[in-house]
């Protein structure tokens, strides 16, 4: 039953909350600043799982296992909707079993039909699973709906099409939804939909000047308003009135889940992240604990139920998508801890409760648990986080100080994998992201050396450029050629991105996510790089060794020979690391020189997900690695293929220990890659110390060093931004991975159960460096005086 949302309702909901600057204008950021309580204690207060929780968990796991054997159910006769699809339950015969309601579909693990990104893609997914869309629905959609994919390919230039065909610019969100937008879903809990709708209406009325930008903005606000009404309707399916604010922590969690699941019902973006939720929920929890409304056991049970709901989220995906994002990730990235501008840390009890779910309901890839790390966080929390990483290898860490230098504020969160966002940033920066996947910079360089002819398919001309004809490659000549190749690559990439995001806003605008954001926002446009380490190492080999080109009778370069030694990126050698910084600077500056859609800000990520494997299979030989080549019959030969390293990782051929890797990455300028610099690391427990306590303590010290400016490299301000931390021995997990058993590991930017990886991806994972020593320097020290 809907409640009339009066002033009395707000007084009741906000009773005991401090401050006024968040009451008259929606701002979870200001609310948190006035009300959160830093927690300096340890994990001893935590509660374990209840029998009810374990029963719900078993139903979810059994249902998923069943569908993995027989196939998941798909909607084939209805288009997805926030409020037109009936309520779903974990067990339809025992609805009271659940504490937190709201599911993606009317049945557990039934997959929604989402054609607005591309009808052909949505129907192909069904075909790949032996199904087909209802003929009547197909006729209606094909005759009346323009999809994002339709719009994009109407506008794509010939240069973009050539680059896509060559797989130099590929994997872009032109055949799947873009994702990476994070609504501030706690707004629904704090204010209720009625408040948010009235605020949107006022902002719509305030726009009086009619021009192109304002016409579009007025329409978008209207769509956001309608989406909020659909969220109210969605809640009503479960007998919940989310038009009003939440009254306690259980309702706060419930309201957040309704907001988030409303998004998941209609938006299948490449990343659907949760944002900075724990700290807000903690404020409600602390009030309820003080009042005696709920016990610690009850609050943990609410959190467990919420996390179990998040783990039910699943999208229908095409096989081509799975090659780029294997393991079926949903990137429900949940950010916690961090520092406030006033010098107080932002660790709360709720952060512990979220991490505790790895024990209470078991280790799992989702949600993507992310700790915003600073050396000034309480040691008890840092140690607890490291002990959970040591046990589970399913938490990632992001450096607060590094990100703050580029304007990411105290309520910043992580989108998808490693990309920081600041959704309520009042200076109009970093509010959301226009996602752009990544392009193959190494392939562009190799193609440029061959005069614009593809590095695998030598008869295919991708772009116009003079070839490098030298037998022995000269560094300055190669860099001049590479600079021109980067001009072509970035020009083409920007054109594709501007088209993609224009058409996404036009044909599949994410109104429900945008409804939980400030009305006036500015986006980051996230450009990415693949093949980074091999590009840097190739340039280093050309500069510091002797690189000879091997050519066919037409002068086409098909391979390279290297004589002499050269430094590699990842060895803490400034000669190579300076080249890495130069490549990043060149790439970012070229992108930033362009006019971007809606005045977005150009950002760059060194992140690959599992696409490093896919891109490796599309790239020929370089001076530092073996790629693919064509057989006489024109098929691609992968027999000698060496996979790209993921993200910002150094090549597996780089010498040195973990600390040398960390130093090389810390030298990269975050301003040139402020969409994320992803390091995925595997370190043996034996490398960290003899006892578990010693290993955990050393992990704390190493992360403090990596994320504190100057701590790893004395006399500098260098610091890292991201670490995917796996604490494991390869020999302990190799057989399990290859047999397809459950092994949870962190890969480039997310967490995956390795049983869902392809054989090639499993091979690449096990070929990565598993550090058995911290350093190849016996005199190694971290400058802990700087921490």
Swiss-Prot record:
Q: Name one GO cellular component term.
A: cytosol
Give the residues annotated as active site: 416 (s-acetylcysteine intermediate), 417 (cysteine radical intermediate)
Q: Which lineage?
A: Bacteria, Bacillati, Bacillota, Bacilli, Lactobacillales
Q: Which keywords does UniProt give here?
A: Acyltransferase, Carbohydrate metabolism, Cytoplasm, Glucose metabolism, Organic radical, Transferase
Q: What is this protein called?
A: Formate acetyltransferase
Tell me where in or outside the cell this protein is found.
Cytoplasm
InterPro entries registered for this protein in UniProt: Auton_GlycylRad_Cofactor, Form_AcTrfase, Form_AcTrfase_GR_CS, Gly_radical, PFL_dom
- Subunit architecture: Homodimer.
Please list the GO terms describing molecular function: formate C-acetyltransferase activity
- UniProt-listed Enzyme Commission number(s): 2.3.1.54
Ranges where the Glycine radical domain occurs: 645-774
Q: Which organism is it from?
A: Lactococcus lactis subsp. cremoris (strain MG1363)
Catalytic reaction annotation: formate + acetyl-CoA = pyruvate + CoA
> Additional comments on file?
Several mechanisms have been proposed based on complexes formed with substrate analogs. After activation by the glycine radical, the cysteine radical, Cys-417, can abstract hydrogen atoms from the other active site cysteine, Cys-416, and from coenzyme A, and it can also transfer hydrogen atoms to product radicals. The other active site cysteine can attack the central carbonyl of pyruvate and covalently bind the product acetyl group.
């Amino acid at each position: 039953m809907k409640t009339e949302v009066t002033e009395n309702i707000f007084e009741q909901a906000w009773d005991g909350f401090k401050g006024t600057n968040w009451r008259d204008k929606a701002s979870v950021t200001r609310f948190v600043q006035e009300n959160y309580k830093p927690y300096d204690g340890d994990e001893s207060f935590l509660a374990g799982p209840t029998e009810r929780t374990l029963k719900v968990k078993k139903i979810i796991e059994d249902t998923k296992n069943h569908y993995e054997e027989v196939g998941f159910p798909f909607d084939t006769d209805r288009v997805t909707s926030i409020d037109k699809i009936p309520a779903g339950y974990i067990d339809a015969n025992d609805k009271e079993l659940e504490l937190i309601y709201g599911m993606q579909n009317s049945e557990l693990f039934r997959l929604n039909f989402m054609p607005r990104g591309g009808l052909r893609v949505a129907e192909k997914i069904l075909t790949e699973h032996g199904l087909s869309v209802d003929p009547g629905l197909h006729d209606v959609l094909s005759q009346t709906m323009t999809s994002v994919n339709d719009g994009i390919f109407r506008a794509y230039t010939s240069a973009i099409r050539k680059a896509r065909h060559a797989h130099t610019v590929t994997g872009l969100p032109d055949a799947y939804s873009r994702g990476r937008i994070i609504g501030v879903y706690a707004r629904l809990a704090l204010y209720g939909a009625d408040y948010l709708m009235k605020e949107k209406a006022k902002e719509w009325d305030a726009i009086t000047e009619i021009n192109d930008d304002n016409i579009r903005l007025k329409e978008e606000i209207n769509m956001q308003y309608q989406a909020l009404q659909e969220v109210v309707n969605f809640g009503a399916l479960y007998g919940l009135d989310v038009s009003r604010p939440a009254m306690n922590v259980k309702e706060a969690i419930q309201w957040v889940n309704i907001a988030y699941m409303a998004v998941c019902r209609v938006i299948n973006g490449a990343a659907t992240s949760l944002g900075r939720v724990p700290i807000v929920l903690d404020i409600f929890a602390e009030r309820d604990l003080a009042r005696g409304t709920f016990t610690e056991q009850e609050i943990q049970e609410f959190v467990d139920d919420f996390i179990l709901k998040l783990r039910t989220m699943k999208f229908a995906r095409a096989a081509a998508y799975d090659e780029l994002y294997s393991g079926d990730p949903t990137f429900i990235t949940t950010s916690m801890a961090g520092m406030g501008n006033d010098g107080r840390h932002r660790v709360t009890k709720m952060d512990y409760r979220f991490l505790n779910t790895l024990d209470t309901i078991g280790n799992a890839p989702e949600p993507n648990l992310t700790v915003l790390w600073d050396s000034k966080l309480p040691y008890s929390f840092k140690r607890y986080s490291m002990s959970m990483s040591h046990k589970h290898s399913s938490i990632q860490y992001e450096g607060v100080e590094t990100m703050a230098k580029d304007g990411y504020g105290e309520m910043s969160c992580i989108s998808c994998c490693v990309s920081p966002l600041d959704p309520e940033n009042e200076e109009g920066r970093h509010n959301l992201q226009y996602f752009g996947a990544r392009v193959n910079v190494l392939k562009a360089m190799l193609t440029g050396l061959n005069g614009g002819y593809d590095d695998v398919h030598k008869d295919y001309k991708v772009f116009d450029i003079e070839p490098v004809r030298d037998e022995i490659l000269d560094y300055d000549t190669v860099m001049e050629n590479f600079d021109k190749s980067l001009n072509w690559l970035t020009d083409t990439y920007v054109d594709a991105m501007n088209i993609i995001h224009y058409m996404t806003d036009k044909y599949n605008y994410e109104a429900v996510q945008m409804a939980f954001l400030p009305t006036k926002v500015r986006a980051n446009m996230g450009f990415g790089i693949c093949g980074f380490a091999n590009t840097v190492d190739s340039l280093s080999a050309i500069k510091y060794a002797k690189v000879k080109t091997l050519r066919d009778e037409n002068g086409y370069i098909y391979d390279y020979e290297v004589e002499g030694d050269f430094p590699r990126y990842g060895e803490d050698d400034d000669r190579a690391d300076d080249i890495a910084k130069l490549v990043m600077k060149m790439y970012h500056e070229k992108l930033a020189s362009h006019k971007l859609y809606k005045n977005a800000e150009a950002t760059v990520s060194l992140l690959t997900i599992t696409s490093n494997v896919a891109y490796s299979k599309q790239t020929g030989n370089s001076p530092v690695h073996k790629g693919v080549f064509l057989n006489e019959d024109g098929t691609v030969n992968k027999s000698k293929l060496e996979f790209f390293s993921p993200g910002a990782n150094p090549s597996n051929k780089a010498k040195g220990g973990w600390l040398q890797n960390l130093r090389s990455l810390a030298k990269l300028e975050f301003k040139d890659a402020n969409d994320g610099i992803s390091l995925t690391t595997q370190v043996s427990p034996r490398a960290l110390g003899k006892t578990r306590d010693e290993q955990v303590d050393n992990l704390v010290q190493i992360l403090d060093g990596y994320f504190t400016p100057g701590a790893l490299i004395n006399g500098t301000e260098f610091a890292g931004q991201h670490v995917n931390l796996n604490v494991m021995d390869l020999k302990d997990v190799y057989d399990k991975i290859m047999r397809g058993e459950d092994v949870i590991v962190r890969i480039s930017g997310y967490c995956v159960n390795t049983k869902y990886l392809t054989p090639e991806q499993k091979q690449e994972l096990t070929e990565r460096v598993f550090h058995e020593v911290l350093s190849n320097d016996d005199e190694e020290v971290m400058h802990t005086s700087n921490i």
